[in-house]
């Protein structure tokens, strides 16, 4: 959805409908069930239309699940893929070391979530024939594992957990993530916002990239000011950047809410 702001500049917002289990036709049998979601997007667009530009600099922020997810995938997940570790990623010399506060546990789920439900992208066996199982990557802030193929698992003396997949049948299997997430904590969103005097609550992203040093840059499509512990005005598009393991070592609150996002695509050379 697009609208013109009072200054004549266009503002845009979008969201992904569907995703998760099933195929496209499973999610779009009745368009009416998305009317409420579309109304919400229009309301957000009108807020963004009146939004303000962010101030540059270091800020305390709250990251919604969409931002936490892209951080887990792009800025952390790729650095602990063992082929990239062999290529010199930041994780190469950090195994067994603290890379985050003890609030952070990050897992790459194979096919079944802790509550017994099916993961958004269930993988039961990978393209090397390895039975898939969960891989704990960060445990209470300590980097404890890599995602492996059979070859890299032998190199590192680890067990493969089914992370080798090819984009198509003719592609060589590469080490890939499956259902990667930072596990929820115990804090409430309202308490997290109340703890910030001057910062931002970022809710939606429109792009992101990172390199093997963990340095990242994410586009922010929707968010709000936080002033004196309360949400303020909506903001216009902006960009955040940082270094993942440095950021994770500043986390002091973690929401008890968890939302899966199925909107991303990841090529990794294929």
What are these regions (language model features)?
Residues 1-270:
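N-terminal small-residue-enriched
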